């Protein structure tokens, strides 16, 4: 991966560094995209569809869910940060969030760890079902920090396809446990 300007997207500098290569891709209408995926003509990762802006109904739903769940989320993020801090002791923690679902949780964990005085770094990296993880991004993280403090963060587990990709991707890379952290 070439040296690059730090990209943080809509997050604050210091919350996450995305190790992604910018690409330009033509938008595919959702119905056409679904047809191409179902027919096997294209992989889901080869296409993007324009996402509409959230409606007021969606925004209201989000705010109601946030109001109901914020306290629990804060408690659980704090518990996870404490567990990581205890597990790693004085060793810095390197959060490798799987884009996109892992990044919001990774940002919250990174902030919680910093608030506890724990040294941590946070990266957003790509992993795609049936295609694997971005090896160049892992190379950058490993070169900067080694492998012993890396913790992978995902915010969506679904049926486990991405977990399987992660296990397969790390199997032949030295320094990782059999089951990723």
Q: Model regions: which residues?
A:
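PRPP-associated nucleotide enzymes
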Residues: 1-181
């Amino acid at each position: 991966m070439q040296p690059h300007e730090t990209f943080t997207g809509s997050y604050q500098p210091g919350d996450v560094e995305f190790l992604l290569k910018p690409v330009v891709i033509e938008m595919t209408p959702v119905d056409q995209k679904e047809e191409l995926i179902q027919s096997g003509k294209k992989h889901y990762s080869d296409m993007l569809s324009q996402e509409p802006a959230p409606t007021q109904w969606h925004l209201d739903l989000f705010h109601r869910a946030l109001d109901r769940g914020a306290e629990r989320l804060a408690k659980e993020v704090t518990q996870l940060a404490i567990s990581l801090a205890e597990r790693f002791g004085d060793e810095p923690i390197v959060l490798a969030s799987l884009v996109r679902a892992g990044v919001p949780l990774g940002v919250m964990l990174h902030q919680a760890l910093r608030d506890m005085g724990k040294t941590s770094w946070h990266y957003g990296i790509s992993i795609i079902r049936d295609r694997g993880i971005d090896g160049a991004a892992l190379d950058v993280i490993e070169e900067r920090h080694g492998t012993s403090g890396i913790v992978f963060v995902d915010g969506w587990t679904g049926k486990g396809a991405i977990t399987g990709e992660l296990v397969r991707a790390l199997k032949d890379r030295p320094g990782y446990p059999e089951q990723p952290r």
